[in-house]
Amino acid sequence: MISETIRSGDWKGEKHVPVIEYEREGELVKVKVQVGKEIPHPNTTEHHIRYIELYFLPEGENFVYQVGRVEFTAHGESVNGPNTSDVYTEPIAYFVLKTKKKGKLYALSYCNIHGLWENEVTLE
C-alpha cells in the first residue's frame, strides 16, 4: 500500500515534513504549506521538493477533498547543465478554501530522493 511509504515526523527536526499554518476568516480559510521552515531543504537539480498537495477531511465525513496541488519546477537547471541557472522555486504553497466545517487539513510533500512526507493539523 502507498500509505506504508508515506513518512512523517516533527517538522522542527525533519526538513521534509510540510508545515501547515492557517487563518480562518469566517468561511474563508487561508492555508500556507511550507517545506523546510525550521531546517532548510536542499533545492538543487539533484535534490529538491517537487510538489505539495493539500487535502481537507471535514469532521464526521469519510472521504477527503483535494484542495489543491502546487508543483515546483525550477531547480537551477538550464541548457548549460545542472545548477547553472540561478532560478529556483521555493517549496511554499498558498491555498484558500471556503468552508464552515471543522476537520483535518492534510499536506503531502514529495522529495525527489526521499519520497512522500505528510503532516496534519486540526481546522477549528
From Swiss-Prot:
InterPro entries: Desulfoferrodoxin_Fe-bd_dom (IPR002742), Desulfoferrodoxin_Fe-bd_dom_sf (IPR036073), Desulfoferrodoxin_SOR (IPR051233). Fe cation binds at residues 14, 16, 41, 47, 111, 114. One of its GO terms (molecular function) is iron ion binding. Its cofactor is Fe cation. Keywords: Electron transport, Iron, Metal-binding, Oxidoreductase, Transport. Gene3D superfamilies: SOR catalytic domain. SUPFAM superfamilies: Superoxide reductase-like. It holds the Pfam family Desulfoferrodox. It catalyses: reduced [rubredoxin] + superoxide + 2 H(+) = oxidized [rubredoxin] + H2O2. Its EC number is 1.15.1.2. Coiled coil: none annotated. Homotetramer. Uses electrons from reduced NADP, by way of rubredoxin and an oxidoreductase, to catalyze the reduction of superoxide to hydrogen peroxide. Belongs to the desulfoferrodoxin family. This is Superoxide reductase. The lineage of its organism: Archaea, Methanobacteriati, Methanobacteriota, Thermococci, Thermococcales. The gene is sorA.
